[in-house]
């Protein structure tokens, strides 16, 4: 689960990580008071959306007058912001964070994430922070400092000091950096975080270390342990269909293709999409109905797929282990009748009671083509779509 920048900064402030003074708004009635309360003569208006690249998308704007602040706020509030990290539709802007401009001496990058290769929490830091950090990582990876933390151990002050030296900090900045990194590590480990990032982490002309931005991604599966974090969820930033799918324990991701996919198991779902692509088709979605597939869940899956106007056909690929294929077939027939589906469907069943399930589907009056071989099923669905 992602949260907004202002929410991340609130968590930072509670852990004594230094952040700029900012005021959150959702309307423009008191812009003059906001700017005066922040002080200074240049302000930064920052759109609050769950995506990076806001600066490149026009969502972070410097204003040299209160009049411009008001004009920019009116333009952004209620709009949809498109950035390099959103789709073509963009994300709705319902809130803005206004901050006074900082006197920046240097921009750095700092994050913690789970490294799947080393199986460690890894600190990433760089002296080249800012909007082009992705370019730095791809073109000059030597500029990124990596430090792995033993999952059975902890992050020490000595570890932080080691990284501070790598970044060229003096004694005062090292003290501030150590506090910042140790606090980030506490949030990461205590709140079941997947990624926590400050970009940029700035050094001001006053020799202060400030988190100018904040990004946190929490493990959805651990939210039951963190009711305070779960309350920070903003469903306006989520794809509506993906949100509805999650309520039925369906893992659903929308693509741009025209062949709907319904599969049980993430690995099998990816293999199914690969085969469709291999034979010249284009998947419209990733949809994993999970191991405990029920008729209701299958019906909801068909309903989600059918709402996409670009979908021309559907491939169902089920491997019956604990779940019996004949029960799955009954669920498919019930779901098709309930949803009123008329698109051509190819169903591949394999596993427990697969012959019985395929026989049930063959006898039905619906537009269903059955296969026991996945390759043949992929070829068939591509032909039907063309």
Curated annotation (Swiss-Prot):
Catalytic activity, EC: 6.2.1.5
Enzyme class: ligase
Pathway noted in the entry: Carbohydrate metabolism; tricarboxylic acid cycle; succinate from succinyl-CoA (ligase route): step 1/1
Cofactor: Mg(2+)
GO MF term (any one): succinate-CoA ligase (ADP-forming) activity
Annotated Mg(2+) binding sites: 199, 213
A cellular-component GO term for this protein: succinate-CoA ligase complex
GO biological process: succinyl-CoA metabolic process; tricarboxylic acid cycle
InterPro entries: ATP-grasp_succ-CoA_synth-type, ATP_grasp_subdomain_1, Succ-CoA_synthase_bsu_CS, SUCC_ACL_C, Succ_CoA_ligase-like_bsu, Succinyl-CoA_synth-like
Keywords of this entry: ATP-binding, Ligase, Magnesium, Metal-binding, Nucleotide-binding, Tricarboxylic acid cycle
Record's cofactor remark: Binds 1 Mg(2+) ion per subunit.
Family assignment from sequence similarity: Belongs to the succinate/malate CoA ligase beta subunit family.
Task of the protein: Succinyl-CoA synthetase functions in the citric acid cycle (TCA), coupling the hydrolysis of succinyl-CoA to the synthesis of either ATP or GTP and thus represents the only step of substrate-level phosphorylation in the TCA. The beta subunit provides nucleotide specificity of the enzyme and binds the substrate succinate, while the binding sites for coenzyme A and phosphate are found in the alpha subunit.
Known partners and oligomeric status: Heterotetramer of two alpha and two beta subunits.
Name of the protein described by the UniProt record: Succinate--CoA ligase [ADP-forming] subunit beta
Organism the protein comes from: Ruthia magnifica subsp. Calyptogena magnifica
Gene name in the database record: sucC
